[in-house]
Amino acid sequence: VLLKTERQITEQGLNKISSGLLPEGTVLISSRAPIGYIAVAEVPLAINQGFIAMKCNGLLDTQFVLQWTLANGSTFQEISKKAFRPIKVVYPDNGLLDEFEKIVGTLHKRCVDLVKQNNRLTEMRDNLSPKLISGELRVEDVNGV
């Protein structure tokens, strides 16, 4: 799950890259060492040539594509986009895909919510700990938090 990026691209930079701004729900695969890292973009983002972006565009469910990529490992040091493009994706009929999305989509949303909650709790801990240690704040003062 990719909730945010470390760096932000400028409009000028976005105009110079071929990938453009990729939509939320894009499945990303690192194609250079380290190869095989996989994530689902939960925010629009831009990538460099070290990634393969699988935009589902409603043709296939993001969760199905994610699970398909996780099920197909690799031992290569690098995979080019040219070598990746002809790979065939075998997928079930729409009824089964819909059932899959109902189950796995709910689980994925829960995972995303838990990651967000964990990030908020980490931020709260990082903000409160120094104040508690220094005595600037006491536990009794934060009971309502």
Spans of model-derived segments:
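Polybasic, glycine- and aromatic-enriched phosphate-binding surface used to engage nucleic acids
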Residues: E11-S31, Y37, G58-W68
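Sequence-specific dsDNA recognition surfaces
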Residues: V1-E24, E42, I47
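A short glycine-rich beta-alpha junction/loop motif
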Residues: S31, L45-I52, A71-D98
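Amphipathic alpha-helical coiled-coil/heptad-repeat segments
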Residues: L59-L60, A83, I87-V145
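Generic alpha-helical structural context detector
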Residues: I52, L66-L70, P130
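Short, contiguous acidic/charged loop-to-helix segments that flank catalytic cores in large enzymes
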Residues: Q12-G13, A53-M54, C111-V112
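Flexible loop/turn segments at secondary-structure boundaries
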Residues: V1, I35-I38
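Solvent-exposed alpha-helices and their adjacent loops that cap or buttress functional pockets
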Residues: G20-L22, A46, S80, G105, ...
